[in-house]
C-alpha cells in the first residue's frame, strides 16, 4: 500500500477531523488542513503534498477553483470531495484538472483507490509534460542548427554536408 502526504480542505471541521482520522488509519500523513479554497491553494503551494483532497463547496474560493490553480501549476494530485455527483459537476471537475472524485459520505474502501489512482495519473501527467518540454527544446535546438547551417552554406558557398561537418568539428573542438 502507498502512503501519501495529504492536504485536506473542507469548510466543515467535523468532516476534516473524520478525514484526518481515516487517512491516518490508512497510513497516510495529513500535512495540512484548510477550511477554504484560498488557504487550500496557499497550503498546497507551500507544503507540496502528494495529494490534495478538496471539498467542492467552500468559502473564499471553491474547491474547483483551488483544484484548477493547483492542477495548472502541477503542484500535486487533486481529489475532489463532494456531495454532488451530477454530470455538470463532474464536467467542471474534469476541466479543473481533478484526477479522482469521491462522493460524500466517503467510505473507507473508496479512499485508498482514489488516492492511488490520482497519484499515478499525476505522475504520468508530470512525466508527459517533462517529455514535451524536452522535445520542445530539441525542436528549438534543431531549428537553430538548421538556420546556422544555412548561414554557413550561404557565406562560404559550401554544401549542406560540408556545413554540417564544420559545425560538428567546431562543437568537438569547443567541447560541446
Language model segments and positions:
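Receiver (REC) domain switch/output surface
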Residues: 94-96, 111-123
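C-terminal output helix
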Residues: 88, 106-115
